[in-house]
Amino acid sequence: MEQKEMIDLLRQVASGTMDVEQAALKLKEEPFEDLGFAKIDHHRAMRQGVAEVIYGEGKTPEQIFRIAEAMKEKGQKAVLITRMNKESAIYVGERLELQYDEASRIGFIGEAPIKDGDGKIVVATGGTSDIPVAEEAARTAETLGNEVVRLYDVGVAGVHRLLGHLDELMEARVIIAVAGMEGALASVIGGLVDCPVIAV
């Protein structure tokens, strides 16, 4: 159950369109489901505002499918799967309607959330080889309802490439700087902006 659904449920009780016993039954649903190999936290969205995400690394295709299926059955509108390999994507995609991006290894099932309108997240890379990690961050942020601006190959070896995007950097509410070969990108960005900078 998501927080919005819980608020709607309580409003129904307050308005008299649902009785207290019906509401109690809905709220009593197990907060987690034990599949033997995984315990799915169905109430995470209600507590934290964001539903549980499936970390695909190390899980079998069948395990990923069963977790995603259980989430959908309990009413989770969007299921995000990170670090999903192609074999798992094929397996899950044959059983559920899956969108898969091979570069970022992100799988997505369900309805994309409406953008929250709370500003933009900038994802910047030092070089082209950093793009897969950056895309994982960008697609995850988008799946969680954020607007994302991508600034790729803007490393400090050619600082003019970064400075050419100063307006976008200044408008960001948070910046994710992905730079595997050079550690300076996050520091340089941090010296230019007043928002949080996450270094990867």
Residue ranges and their predicted role:
Residues 1-85, 90, 94:
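Long amphipathic alpha-helical segments
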Residues 53-54, 120-126, 175-177:
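Short glycine-rich or small-residue beta-strand-to-loop segments that form or flank ligand, phosphate
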Residues 62-64, 130-135, 159-160, 179-188:
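Short glycine/serine/threonine-rich phosphate/pyrophosphate-binding segments
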Residues 94-96, 192-193:
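Short, structured coil segments at secondary-structure junctions
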Residues 106-110, 147-171:
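Glycine-rich oxoanion-binding loops at beta->alpha junctions
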Residues 118-160:
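Glycine-rich phosphate/diphosphate-binding loop of Rossmann-like nucleotide-binding domains
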Residues 164-200:
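Glycine-rich phosphate-binding loop
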